[in-house]
Amino acid sequence: MSRINLLLLCGGGSAEHDISLMSANYFESSLAKSDQFSVLRVELDKLGQYRTAAGDECELTNNREIRFRDETKAPWPVDYVIPCIHGYPGETGDIQSYFNLIQLPYFGCESEASSNCFNKITAKMWFSALGIPNTPYIFLHQYDDEAISQAQTALANWGSIFIKAASQGSSVGCYKVDDSSKVAQVLKDAFGYAPYVVVEKTIKARELEVAVYEYNGEIVATLPGEIICDTNTFYTFDEKYAKSSKARTDVVAKDVSVELSEQIRAYAIKAFKGMKLRHLSRIDFFLTAENEILLNEINTFPGSTPISMFPKMLQNHGHDFTEYLSLVINNQLSAKD
């Protein structure tokens, strides 16, 4: 049996570029445990330039091959691609649209599902349409006096708010605001990251995460894990990835009843099916002191860094990451044939 030429595409040039490289390390080491794959790792920078790990400039052509700038190097045909790119253009659906155009099979959610989940406004509309509870919010489409007034009214009504760029990940462009005098500047900062902004009511709650993925034709939802931050903090970009972070994670959340755990998992599977996700996702929830469950967000290409929850929860559920990748890829390529 010939080996599968697998393109591991990483980076992307967004604010999450370096995190994507860390996740790619995990994918690369996992794929190396199987003799089924011949892996070429290529980094995409913010200028749209492709480079191999060896530094060779190249491009992914519509003939489904990597063509090198050094013409003495033979083109490398691509059978399959893993777009290990957090944020733009990986989780936004953009690069998946290109793969669809050139008919290149790829790992992860398809373009429309990726786009719907990445945009916080679209996602919340989907959550509500599916009957899944989520945090109260308003959305703003431009930075002006009216937007500032709406955000200040929301703060007055809710006591504390989050102002979030609608299309960013890893808490980029996300700010907790308790002081009305800071609303205008924070709103301006958020609009610097995206053309739309979401203002959400601050929810004092536990932050629970569920890994939801396809395994041998079944949609699997793990037991909820938990992100635990210092009191009065939230899981910022720095809290996620800085060495000084005091946040910790429990692969299985403690003191969550079986009934609540099963309801969270049911909501997660409902979201996965309803939004037509594919292969993998991490679905995040709030659990309040009153045991109210609120869907927070869906990550269509969850991080796979040393501190990331998705691979830990998958492994805790009894599945091996390399075997999982092999099953998904082989099933997909077999269906294509």
From Swiss-Prot:
Pathway recorded for this protein: Cell wall biogenesis; peptidoglycan biosynthesis
Disulfides per UniProt: none
Gene3D superfamilies xrefs: 3.40.50.20, ATP-grasp fold, A domain (3.30.1490.20), ATP-grasp fold, B domain (3.30.470.20)
MF annotations from Gene Ontology: ATP binding; D-alanine-D-alanine ligase activity; metal ion binding
Gene Ontology BP terms: cell wall organization; peptidoglycan biosynthetic process; regulation of cell shape
Residue positions binding Mg(2+) 2: E297, N299
InterPro entries: ATP-grasp, ATP_grasp_subdomain_1, D-Ala_lig_Van_CS, D_ala_D_ala, Dala_Dala_lig_C, Dala_Dala_lig_N, PreATP-grasp_dom_sf
Function of the molecule: Cell wall formation.
Name this protein carries in UniProt: D-alanine--D-alanine ligase
The encoding gene: ddl
